[in-house]
UniProtKB/Swiss-Prot annotation:
Alphabetical list of HAMAP family matching this protein: GTPase_MnmE
Protein name: tRNA modification GTPase MnmE
Cofactor(s) of this protein: K(+)
UniProt keywords, alphabetically: Cytoplasm, GTP-binding, Hydrolase, Magnesium, Metal-binding, Nucleotide-binding, Potassium, tRNA processing
GN (gene name): mnmE
Residues involved in K(+) binding: 244, 263, 265, 268
């Protein structure tokens, strides 16, 4: 991303682009923020952390009646301390909503010396000014973009620095390990005595203990983070079964809309239909698949092949049965594929409102999609997924963070083998230093511009 200058004064609409919103906020940040706003604001220039009333004017014409919040910093000796979000002079104009007036104020700020901010530039400046690290910036972005209350709660908990503390604790443990190994490099005579003592007392190498402890924590973080990210983005649920068991009816009931064709003709769903299903604090990406059976129609064969692929891609497979028809070879085929691929699997009997002579065992969940009676299914789904600890400090639920943790693990695995097999300690130090640097990237202790560009490009314009 080509930022023109970090010393420029920037501005942007921070309240979104809803044309009918009652109030809008225009944010201005930079060393010339006060002088630029003063050119278009008729009210009093406020002191730091005050709000003043007045009018935005273009020449003598009133554009809007506004409140202006001033965050101009406090002199402390020879420096000015900025206790605000960005860490530099910051002003926010609270105007009446509507894009005509809001854009006019933005236009006046730009014509008087400000420039339009890049996406995420306010937060980028906050990072560069030491007001936050990248783990907190990640939390802010994820909080804004949260799709469920669980996700929002998890990200909000990181605003006090819990994610940063996890990384710093890991770095502290890693520093002890690196220091211990470096002693062995610089003073090998002590290591010989140390290893003889280990053999005599059958004690595990303290360095091996430390790297194993570090690896266990990293593995836990990766597992928790991948699970959480999957839940936050949407759990993929494939509805599979023979034709005409009610898969499309169930999909429509869950989505509360007619997404799929529902008829009495078997095989009418020939492609995969997707929809988003919200259940309490969980998001499910529902996939309604073509019924699995023998067919001579080429187009239906393609749909059935896609159904098998949907099973492989799903996080959980909902195998739907018809209350009037017992299991057969096609149901067994589905069950076999699910078991071979170690998928979460639930068996659901539809049309429970119809009388049947079939005795279904207790592990079958009974519903009636046609009558919108799916509470048993919903309760079961919540039981499966509600046990996960969404408040864990080990959750770092962005693709960027997970990628860096996985890279860290690879360096840790390599270092462990070098320590375990008593290879040269110098090689272990190289991998451990790479591990240290990779963990530092998670909180942003790096001068890499490409890392910052990738980090902030997805932020909204006024953040």
């Amino acid at each position: 991303m080509n930022y023109q200058s970090y010393s420029d004064t920037i501005c942007a609409i921070s309240s979104g682009n809803n044309i009918n919103q009652p109030i809008s906020i225009i944010r201005i940040s930079g060393k010339n923020a006060q002088s630029i706003v003063s050119k278009i604001f008729s009210g009093k220039v406020g002191e730091n952390k005050t709000i003043t009333y007045g009018f935005i004017k273009e020449n003598s014409e009133i554009v809007d009646e506004v409140l202006v919040s001033w965050f101009l910093g406090e002199p402390q000796g020879d420096i000015t301390v900025y206790n605000n979000y960005v860490g530099e002079p910051l002003i926010e104009i609270n105007a009446h909503g509507g894009m005509i007036v809001t854009n006019k104020i933005l236009e006046l700020l730009i014509s008087n010396g400000a420039r339009l901010a890049e996406p995420g530039e306010f937060t980028r400046r906050a990072f560069l000014n030491g007001k936050l690290d990248l783990s907190k910036a990640d939390a802010i972005h994820n909080l804004i973009m949260s799709k469920t209350r669980l996700q929002a709660r998890n990200e909000a908990s990181k605003l006090k620095g819990s994610a940063s503390k996890v990384i710093k604790d890991l770095l502290k443990e890693l520093s002890l390990l690196i220091g211990s190994i470096e002693v062995g490099i610089d003073y090998p005579e002590y290591i010989d005595d140390y290893e003889e003592d280990l053999k005599a007392n059958s004690k595990e190498d303290i360095n091996l203990t430390r790297i194993n402890k570090l690896i266990a924590r990293l593995e836990k973080i990766v597992k928790s983070s991948e699970t959480a990210l999957n839940y936050f983005e949407g759990i993929k649920l494939a509805i599979v079964g023979k034709p005409n068991v009610g898969k499309s009816s169930l999909l429509n009931t869950m989505l509360k809309e007619d997404k799929a064709i529902v008829t009495n003709v078997a095989g009418t769903t020939r492609d995969i239909v997707e929809g988003i299903y919200y259940l309490d604090n969980f998001i499910f990406k529902i996939i309604d698949t073509a019924g699995i059976r023998k067919t001579r129609q080429e187009i239906e064969k393609i749909g059935i092949e896609r159904s098998y692929k949907a099973i492989l891609d799903a996080d959980i497979v909902l195998h739907l049965f018809d209350n009037l028809n017992s299991e057969d070879e096609f149901d067994l085929d589905i069950k076999k594929i699910v078991q071979e691929n170690n998928k979460n699997y639930i068996k659901v009997v539809n049309k429970s409102d119809l009388k049947s002579d079939i005795k279904w065992s207790d592990d079958f969940i009974k519903i009636s999609a046609k009558n919108n009676d799916i509470k048993n299914l919903e309760d079961h789904l919540l039981k499966i997924y509600s046990g996960f600890d969404f408040n864990s400090e080990d959750i770092f639920a962005t693709a960027r963070q997970i990628k860096l943790f996985k890279e860290s693990l690879e360096y840790a695995y390599a270092a462990r083998e070098e320590i375990k097999n008593q290879l040269t300690y110098i090689t272990a130090i190289v991998d451990l230093n790479n591990l240290f640097d990779t963990l530092q990237l998670i909180i942003g202790n790096s001068n890499r511009e490409d890392l910052l560009d990738e980090m902030f490009k997805n932020f909204c314009l006024g953040k």
